[in-house]
Every structure is written in C-alpha cells, then in structure tokens.
Design a protein with these regions (language model features):
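Short strand-turn-strand beta-turns centered on an Asx-Gly dipeptide
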Residues: 94, 105-116
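Intrinsically disordered, low-complexity Ser/Thr- and acidic-rich flexible linkers and loops
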Residues: 88-99, 133-138
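Surface-exposed beta-strand/loop patches in extracellular or lumenal glycoproteins
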Residues: 77-82, 96-98
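Extended extracellular/luminal ectodomain segments enriched in beta-structured repeat modules
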Residues: 60-62, 70-80
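Short beta-strand/loop motifs in extracellular/secreted proteins, especially
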Residues: 75-77, 105-107, 180
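Accessory carbohydrate-binding/adhesion or oligomerization-edge regions at the termini
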Residues: 1-61, 68, 84-90, 98, ...
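Tight coil/turn sites that cap or link beta-strands
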Residues: 74, 161-164
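Surface-exposed intrinsically disordered loops and tails
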Residues: 126-149
Length: 189
C-alpha cells in the first residue's frame, strides 16, 4: 500500500496527554521509538493477541498513527476509516460509533492539527458493543448490519489544503474484545 505511517506507542494512561501534546506540536515524544510501517490497515493487536505491532500490550494503553498526504489543490479528500469490526464467529466488537465519534473506544483524529469529529451519523449509533462472546445468547441471532463493518460504510470526507496534509490518529486499547488498530484508506469518490 502507498500509505506510509509513523506509529508511536503503546503508552499507558498517565502519559497519554503528554504524548498527544508532543505529537500535535510536531515533536517526537521522549522515550518512544517510532515504528515505520505502511498499509491501509494497521494492526496494533488482534483479538487473538498473537499478531500486530504490539501483541503483548494490555488494555489501558494508547497508540498514535501519523501520516501525510499531498493534495494538489484545497478541497475534499475521502477515506474509508475504521477501528474495529465484529468477529463473525462471536460478534465481539467495540460497536457502532456514537454520533460525532470515530469508535466507542475514544478514537480521535486530527487533520493539520485540527481535531475532526466523525461527520457521519449511523442508525445504530452507540449500539452493538459486545465485550463477550455471544454464543447461546439472543445477540447471536441478530443479523449483521452494514454499519457494523467500517468497509461497508460510506467514505468519510476530509477537508485538506493544497500541499502536504498531516493526519494524526489516536487509538486507545480499551479491552481484549477489541481488534486494536487503525484503518485509513484514501479513495476517489
């Protein structure tokens, strides 16, 4: 994939504000070695815990992913954006984002230093969070909805300036039910 990222973390809660402020100021946080990676999907830790950039990390930590995009003109770019999706066998997932939110885990996005709220509102906003397996429970019989899968939602519009545009994504790890990572795939609309 052509998306190149610099990832910082994982960081426990007591350092999150410090690291966030440094990154927003364009500084490298003390004591953190950046990880260079590429792709539209960055896996920090899978539900199985055996894969990802930080497979041994426990809930309560946060990671940041940063990239830049060039735009020849000021305008709107679109991207497929997501942070978790239900396990098809058990439904374990952080759920559909509430209005204005990127996830039910406290995900935040800045474009050129300005925080951006999710402009999309979903009919299932704030629902379908399953922290435990749904086997033998009524939730297991609920049909999946496209809103539960970030790749089936419409692309998200982002306002960009002419030239280099910096995207910073903060992704907390809130529980082992979560497939912890970042998906950000620019698309043409």
């Amino acid at each position: 994939s052509f998306v190149e990222w610099t990832v910082f973390g994982p960081v426990p809660q007591d350092r999150q504000e410090e690291v966030r402020n440094n990154l927003l100021a364009g500084k490298s946080p003390a004591g953190l070695s950046p990880v260079q990676t590429r792709g539209g999907n960055l896996y920090f830790r899978t539900r199985a815990g055996a894969e990802g950039l930080f497979p041994k990390t426990k809930p309560g930590n946060t990671a940041w992913a940063e990239t830049t995009f060039h735009s020849p003109v000021e305008g709107t770019m679109h991207a497929m954006v997501g942070f978790d999706a239900p396990a098809r066998s058990t439904r374990r997932c952080s759920g559909v984002p509430a209005a204005g939110e990127w996830s039910q885990c406290g995900t935040r996005i800045w474009v050129n230093g300005k925080e951006m709220k999710n402009p999309q509102t979903y009919k299932l906003a704030g629902q379908r969070r399953y922290e435990k397996h749904t086997w033998n429970s009524p939730a297991n019989e609920i049909p999946f909805d496209n809103e539960e899968f970030w790749w089936a939602r419409p692309p998200v519009p982002f306002q960009v300036k002419a030239g280099e545009n910096r995207i910073l994504i903060e992704q907390p790890y809130t529980g082992e039910f979560q497939s912890w990572g970042v998906s950000f795939i620019p698309v043409k609309k």
